[in-house]
Amino acid sequence: MESVLLSARCTANTATVFWNKPENATADTVYEVSLDGGHSVHTNRTHYTFTELIPNTEYCVTVYSIGSIHICTLPARRRIYVTEEPYNAVGDGKTLNTAALQQAFTDCGPNDEVYFPAGIYLTGALDLHSCMSVCLEKDAVLQGSSDPTDYLPRIWSRFEGTEQECYRSLLNAGQLDHTAGANCENILLYGKGTISGGGHVLAERMIDIERENLREYLAQNAALVATCENDRTIPGRVRGRLINLSNCSRIRITGLTLQNGAAWNVHMIYCDDIVTDHCTLRSGGIWNGDGWDPDSSTNCTLFATEFETEDDSVAIKSGKNPEGNAINRPTKHICVFDCHSNGGHGICIGSEMSGGVADVQIWDCDIAASSNGIEIKGTPKRGGYVRNVTVRDCTFPRLLIHSVPYNDDGIPAPEQPYFEDFHFERLHLTGQKQEHGTVESVA
């Protein structure tokens, strides 16, 4: 792992420390944690959050048998209330607030935070920028509209492994550039509120518009369409996500409910150092409704998160043949731990993995309420590799490592993909897959 054994992320009043599970640890291992050498707390999880801290203050956190880390809470920030002058956003769930909210986001400096009090704030696409913070209070909902025109103009993005123009997502950060590093950094999205997309209605409207735009192309390429999952696959690739991070670094999303993107909920493309923790991700009834998707990204960490998704709760990707082979940006150093599913397909690597996937660590997850559990997949055309995957102390319905027939258009890579160096330890495989409220035995 490139990431250090012990890490921390802070707000003004909290510090969350998290660490890699030691090789000799088991599901019963208990860790002792202290702040500035004071009273110790004990936890059987590989993370702990200290609360009621003083802003802009240095502390030392010790996890005995792991190590110590010096941290500094964030300074208290000036709050930009979206409901006050000059923004006057209306949280009635009916008034479209896009212009007002975008102005608040634009005005947010490094020492500010955009603050949403309780209410339902209807909006179209919004753009984030470096060094900003957004706080959603309990019962505050940032609600994406179901009108595709509210997500124009389109932006350059990547969906199912191919770069193309897509509708903007509800929240957008960074500009896509597979030749470069980060162009947007240091963003904090936090609170106890909800970020909710336009969901199924928005998705279907986007697909219908694009199907009409591509009518002649689809008619002339019937053989290509026949290789797709269905006739909505190609037009469906223009959908935005709930949160789209392109070429971003040092982003944290914590405490929020994230739900109902038009496709995937959180999508990281060409990113580094992304932390998502203590969130709830939902996407019931949404086609391709993934939860958390690192895509040609590095050092991404997900923990203490609940899932109820229509598709993969987690999907680790790195592009699709032939473009993914040419761009050749692997996804690596991914940690997923202490996560729980209440529906969905489970934790997946692939099938878009043409740029390669390496060093994935998964531990202490209960994904029993899913259809697939842990799944590593590709197609013979993909090329690339998946290697160095470690999964420990988890519950799944089953473990799948296989080739799949869908999303298989595109020119084949010169070689088939390589799957190698997988380590599985102390897994509880229930043999009972769960999908849409039904339970079925698996072989």
Language model segments and positions:
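Extracellular/periplasmic carbohydrate-active domains that bind, remodel
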Residues: 1-443
